[in-house]
Amino acid sequence: MAIDKKKKEKDVKVHNITDAEEKKKALETAIAFIEKQFGKGAIMKLGDARAMDVEAIPTGSMMLDMALGIGGVPRGRIIEIYGPESSGKTTVALHIIAETQKMGGEVAFIDVEHALDPVYAKNLGVDIDSMLVSQPDSGEQALEIAEALARSGAIDCIVIDSVAAMVTKAEIDGEMGDTHVGQLARLMSQAMRKLTGVVSKSNTTCVFINQVREKIGVMYGNPETTPGGRALKFYASVRIEVRRGEQIKDGGEVLGNRTKCKVVKNKVAPPFKECEFDIMYGKGISRVGEVLDTAVDLGIVKKGGAWFSYEDYKLGQGRDNSKQFLLDHPDIMAEIENKIKASSAEMIAAAGQKNDKKSKLEEKANAGAGISEASEPDSSAEEDFEEFAPIDIGSLGE
């Protein structure tokens, strides 16, 4: 047995190449072999893979787009939107669908909760005639449908609402009081492993909506957690926490509420940024409220005390009056909105230039290191290198 092992180990040769030209040739040979085995594009340089700038789909909220750092949710990635009940999770997801459709993309909504309101979706700007909808019977079915759609390469955005509502086949077949510990977590773990590569290759944005639960017996720290195990937390490129704020009232009538979003995880830009916007009942994210708030943050609209002003215009006293002024003067609102878009585009471009500068400096440093290494005389002769055969541990005891 020891002789057979040694024979096998001797057949596998590992070359120690010191010459730079030989290294380059050896690498080209290795790449050619890998492409022959696994197909063209199995291995490539990162710069050749695709455009370095991450493509994004707007969320329908300017404030949230700015908080995400790239102007929306990234394409070809897994996204998680979670929060308490009635906080605006589905509203944000439907706005992402509407924005995808505006860009000419195909969308799908996997309604695990069986609670999608088509009238509300239409009010938010979703083209319900072209949106694909599925109401699966089990969690396995929901994830298989999502995988099949992503694998087709024809869908630009898939929304799964929600992870917490998924029920496994074993749970459906069992009795009401039966315990099924960790089944959803195992299902999600397997699904994430399969989905990640598929959505990346097809450039599909996969949005998972999730609820929150409380861990029992937590004395210190945040007792809240999300169902479905840890897999989704790891595989998601972006995690957005959505929470409901104070109510928006007109006299005694409640018209909507302030919604707070926090980017808890972000693999494409700096995380932990927060934003607030208005969600109006039956209408979705308030565009005029966002324009006003963003313009104030960027210094386009000036705020002095309770008064809001833009150039020579007095918008009004108080936020509600200023919003009404912008609604009554759509030309001024459009002008402010264009300035906001230009300003946010400049901010994203500046962030990109910063990253490019950093990578160029690294390249320069690496190139300099390569030149200094090449200029040094090779003091080591070939005789100084010995080929060490691996020691057979089994033979030591003989």
From Swiss-Prot:
It comes from the Bacteria. SMART domains: AAA (SM00382). Residues 354-365 have a biased composition (Basic and acidic residues). Residues 375-389 have a biased composition (Acidic residues). The keyword Glycoprotein does not apply. Residues 351-398 are annotated as: Disordered. ATP binds at residues 83-90. It is found in: Cytoplasm. CDD domains: RecA. SUPFAM superfamilies: P-loop containing nucleoside triphosphate hydrolases, RecA protein, C-terminal domain. PROSITE patterns: RECA_1, RECA_2, RECA_3. InterPro entries: AAA+_ATPase, DNA_recomb/repair_RecA, DNA_recomb/repair_RecA_CS, P-loop_NTPase, RecA-like_C, RecA-like_N, RecA_ATP-bd, RecA_C_sf. GO terms for molecular function: ATP binding; ATP hydrolysis activity; ATP-dependent DNA damage sensor activity; damaged DNA binding; single-stranded DNA binding. Keywords: ATP-binding, Cytoplasm, DNA damage, DNA recombination, DNA repair, DNA-binding, Nucleotide-binding, SOS response. One of its GO terms (cellular component) is cytosol. GO terms for biological process: DNA recombination; DNA repair; SOS response. Can catalyze the hydrolysis of ATP in the presence of single-stranded DNA, the ATP-dependent uptake of single-stranded DNA by duplex DNA, and the ATP-dependent hybridization of homologous single-stranded DNAs. It interacts with LexA causing its activation and leading to its autocatalytic cleavage. NCBIfam families: tigrfam_recA. Belongs to the RecA family. This is Protein RecA. It comes from Ruminococcus albus (strain ATCC 27210 / DSM 20455 / JCM 14654 / NCDO 2250 / 7). The lineage of its organism: Bacteria, Bacillati, Bacillota, Clostridia, Eubacteriales.
